């Protein structure tokens, strides 16, 4: 991860990080939790209690935790419940950073902060192509994060309103769920 990027986690993410033992490659300064940085800066647990979990449907309701801006002045809010893959989270983060680099250059390194408030902690399994049915569940292929309606996956601060709006618009194309731009008032 870049040196200028500061990453803080929500209470739910900290609870998940305490639940799953993780390897240290760098530390998050605010909460002091250890997280993994593997596969192009993607964060996910090193090991979980079970290697495979049931699919479970995403609840359509709104959870109170994570629905308000907690760290930054601007953010993106999910309009409906869904699942975010670890690749979509990383792609949205990189799109946001890229927009700030284009618009602000050196000022971004000094002032801007981005918070990723979701952690891909659930493994997804899949079977290879052209394999017959049966013989158990497939091997883990990736990680997802469940996002409820109204949850804020990304926050940013230290940028102008127009730059934040543009970055949120670019980042909204990456995840599969629809999002909207929110501003602290």
Curated annotation (Swiss-Prot):
GO terms for molecular function: rRNA binding; structural constituent of ribosome. It comes from the Eukaryota. It is found in: Mitochondrion. One of its GO terms (cellular component) is mitochondrial large ribosomal subunit. Its main location: mitochondrion. The keyword Cytoplasm does not apply. PANTHER family: 50S/60S RIBOSOMAL PROTEIN L16 (PTHR12220), LARGE RIBOSOMAL SUBUNIT PROTEIN UL16M (PTHR12220:SF24). This is Large ribosomal subunit protein uL16m. It comes from Oryza sativa subsp. japonica. The gene is RPL16.
């Amino acid at each position: 991860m870049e040196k200028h990027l500061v990453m803080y986690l929500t209470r739910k993410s900290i609870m998940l990080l305490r639940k799953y033992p993780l390897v240290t490659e760098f530390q998050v300064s605010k909460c002091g939790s250890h997280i993994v940085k593997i596969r192009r800066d993607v964060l996910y647990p090193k090991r979980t209690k079970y290697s495979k979990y049931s699919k479970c449907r995403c609840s359509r309701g709104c959870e109170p935790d994570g629905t308000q801006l907690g760290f930054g002045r601007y953010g993106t809010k999910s309009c409906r419940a869904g699942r975010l893959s670890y690749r979509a989270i990383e792609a949205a983060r990189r799109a946001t950073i890229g927009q700030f680099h284009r618009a602000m250059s050196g000022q971004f390194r000094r002032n801007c902060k981005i918070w990723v408030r979701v952690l891909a902690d659930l493994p997804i399994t899949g079977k290879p192509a052209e394999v017959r049915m049966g013989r158990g569940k497939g091997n883990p292929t990736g990680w997802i994060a469940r996002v409820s309606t109204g949850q804020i996956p990304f926050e940013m601060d230290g940028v102008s309103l127009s730059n934040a709006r543009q970055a949120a618009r670019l980042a909204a194309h990456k995840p599969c769920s629809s999002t909207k731009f929110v501003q602290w008032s």
